[in-house]
Amino acid sequence: MDKFRVQGRTRLSGEVTISGAKNAALPILFAALLAEDPVELQNVPKLKDIDTTIKLLSQLGVKIERDAASGSVFVDASGVDEFCAPYDLVKTMRASIWALGPLVARFGKGQVSLPGGCAIGARPVDLHITGLEQLSAEIKLEEGYVKASVNGRLKAAHIVMDKVSVGATVTIMSAATLAEGTTVIENAAREPEIVDTANFLNTLGAKITGAGTDRITIEGVARLGGGVYRVLPDRIETGTFLVAAAISGGKVVCRQTRPDTLDAVLAKLREAGADIEVGDDWISLDMHGKRPKAVTLRTAPHPGFPTDMQAQFSLLNLVAEGTGVITETIFENRFMHVPELIRMGAHAEIESNTVICYGVEQLSGAQVMATDLRASASLVLAGCIADGVTIVDRIYHIDRGYEGIEDKLRALGAKIERVKGE
């Protein structure tokens, strides 16, 4: 397995170009199963999860090609002839459940192995299943597979979601585009990636309104065609590089990003003492050589503070002036990076879904292990500012969600190299 070797005590400064959002590109790729004509997706990041999705869609009979130079992916789902997403691909990535809604909506049948992915607590697929059942799909759980079928077209429904779920909102919204009648989703997720998926589907001819609010309306259509669509920039990658500069007293400019998707994160960075400026598609952060101040925050569904930035802000608090408290309300078991940071000299206490961070002036390099995608990013950033050398193991997690992170960090002055596994 590959590792990162990071030499620390670096002030990270410079410019970084932000990639397309993984959390938008994945649902959009699966939603392309609904299109009867070819689709071109631009600004698709080069990531392990994207590669897995392309492989999975190919197995279903989708003709799919990536232009490495431009970052575009060309999808032709006119010849889909297989309706089962098998365990060997699904086990590494729980986003595969997003194949189910489009398959049953367009072809009347689909089955997906129960998913895998990051080991951060229980992320059940129940909300996906109940949503599809309300759209009149018949669901069976057999031999580790979720099997969905319907006679004729799905039927529209008024769906009130038990809890806010990005994944289930995507599933229901995608499937409802081809249902008979008008579907309303109440208590829908409001994330920018939901809006991006809805905008993509509308480009193909869907009739979706209200995405970005808690009430989405989908007027079903008979078919979806093709089109060209550009995936929005990755707000979590943007936030990660802003934190990299903030914890090292540095200065960074993030290009080709969307400041309007990061209000909660920018507010907390300003509270930590960062000098921040924004334009239409750029954000600059300057710490003027100072240590950040500790902040207190709670993760929450959008437009609240994103859970995917929690690990990076845990690190910020652990090297900040003062004491900060972080409460994780979205996922259980999402503080697995904290014991690793304690190995590097951090001082923290975990109580249930809260971590109390007592800032220290300096971390020390150590051998640490990545446990999930965002935790691994925080460990790499910790290595950049720690005294000595840090080895980050199991970095396959980071390759799932950050495109060329070592190259981008090197451009900011980091001393980081990938050590190939045996």
From Swiss-Prot:
Single biological process term from Gene Ontology: UDP-N-acetylgalactosamine biosynthetic process
Coiled-coil regions listed in the entry: none
GO molecular function: UDP-N-acetylglucosamine 1-carboxyvinyltransferase activity
Transmembrane segments: none
Residues annotated to bind UDP-N-acetyl-alpha-D-glucosamine: 94, 123-127, 163-166, 308, 330
Catalytic activity as recorded in UniProt: phosphoenolpyruvate + UDP-N-acetyl-alpha-D-glucosamine = UDP-N-acetyl-3-O-(1-carboxyvinyl)-alpha-D-glucosamine + phosphate
InterPro entries in UniProt: Enolpyruvate_Tfrase_dom, Enolpyruvate_Tfrase_sf, MurA_subfamily, RNA3'P_cycl/enolpyr_Trfase_a/b, UDP_GlcNAc_COvinyl_MurA
Binding positions for phosphoenolpyruvate per the UniProt entry: 22-23
Alphabetical list of CDD domains matching this protein: UdpNAET (cd01555)
UniProt-annotated location(s): Cytoplasm
Pfam families named in the record: EPSP_synthase (PF00275)
EC nos: 2.5.1.7
Modified residues (2-(S-cysteinyl)pyruvic acid O-phosphothioketal): 118
Pathway per the UniProt entry: Cell wall biogenesis; peptidoglycan biosynthesis
Active site positions, chain numbering: 118 (proton donor)
GO cellular component terms, A-Z: cytoplasm
Keyword Transport (UniProt): no
Keywords, alphabetical: Cell cycle, Cell division, Cell shape, Cell wall biogenesis/degradation, Cytoplasm, Peptidoglycan synthesis, Pyruvate, Transferase
Family in the record: Belongs to the EPSP synthase family. MurA subfamily.
Function summary: Cell wall formation. Adds enolpyruvyl to UDP-N-acetylglucosamine.
This protein's name: UDP-N-acetylglucosamine 1-carboxyvinyltransferase
Source organism per UniProt: Yersinia enterocolitica serotype O:8 / biotype 1B (strain NCTC 13174 / 8081)
Upper classification of the organism: Bacteria, Pseudomonadati, Pseudomonadota, Gammaproteobacteria, Enterobacterales
The gene coding this protein: murA
